[in-house]
Design a protein with these regions (language model features):
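Beta-strand elements of well-folded, non-transmembrane domains
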Residues: 55-59, 72-76, 84-86, 175-177, ...
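Extended lipid/amphipathic-ligand handling interfaces
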Residues: 68-72, 92-97, 172-178, 203-204
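Acidic/charged, solvent-exposed loop-and-adjacent secondary-structure segments enriched in E/D, K/R, S/T
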Residues: 98-130
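Sec-dependent bacterial lipoprotein signal peptides
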Residues: 1-21
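Gly/Pro-enriched, hydrophobic low-complexity segments
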Residues: 133-210
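Flexible beta-edge/linker motif
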Residues: 87-93, 101
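Membrane-embedded segments
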Residues: 64, 81, 85-89, 106
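N-terminal leader/targeting segments and the immediate start of mature chains
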Residues: 20-69, 76-77
Length: 210
């Protein structure tokens, strides 16, 4: 009898330890009843983003996988390094719209890795937009961008960006995570013509975050 009680007591302690070690799920805050413009403007203090991620480039039936390190400013200036099997496979910089890369990349890939990264990460930075509500979403729209947001969480679902040449960037978002006080999508896919890029964010830092 004593052995049985001792065994049950030990099992109870083990279960308490296990469940105490399980991370608590943090619920995404709900912004129902709050103006979407106020929620977005609260993020305007964010001036730069540093992030590391896994990255998959796809073109037609081919793909390349790697690990990315990115520093990007709200104005679009960026420094991107992509490593494959531990070796530097691609380096891209953009400053005041001047793009440099090693090795050279074509126009489509350049758009994906500059304007695509800027608009997908700084998704809330949209000016002079109209708001429509439909089926539990907000649609934010101006002359060059359309962003669909979840109406409760004010987090992005997808985005469409019109380029100067008439083509469009298509961006989709999944798997919301939290860093500090900022919620962000940890999986992002950007598509342009026959190209696509999928990011799985590992670490992220928001400079000037709320």
């Amino acid at each position: 009898m004593l052995k049985e009680l001792s065994r049950l007591f030990s099992l109870s302690l083990a279960l308490i330890f296990v469940f105490s070690c399980v991370p608590k799920r943090v619920e995404i805050p709900v912004y129902e009843g709050i103006d979407v413009r106020d929620v977005l403007s609260a993020k305007n203090n964010i001036s730069a983003i540093d992030t590391t991620f896994s990255i998959v480039f796809e073109k037609n039936d081919s793909e390349m996988r790697g690990e990315g390190v990115l520093n990007i400013s709200r104005n679009g200036d960026l420094s991107l390094r992509v490593y494959s099997f531990g070796f530097l496979a691609l380096a891209v910089t953009s400053e005041k719209g001047m793009i440099k890369s090693n090795p050279r990349i074509d126009r489509n890939k350049g758009k994906l890795l500059t304007q695509g990264l800027r608009d997908c990460l700084f998704w809330w930075d949209i000016q002079n937009f109209d708001v429509d509500e439909k089926d539990g979403t907000y649609l934010l729209k101006n002359f060059s961008r359309e962003i669909w947001l979840d109406k409760k969480t004010i987090l992005p679902i997808k985005q469409r960006v019109s380029l100067d040449d008439g083509r469009e960037l298509h961006i989709s978002y999944e798997d919301m995570e939290k860093m500090g006080d900022v919620w962000y999508p940890s999986k992002i896919r950007i598509e342009l013509s026959q190209y696509s890029v999928t990011l799985r964010i590992r670490e992220i830092l928001f400079t000037g975050a709320v």
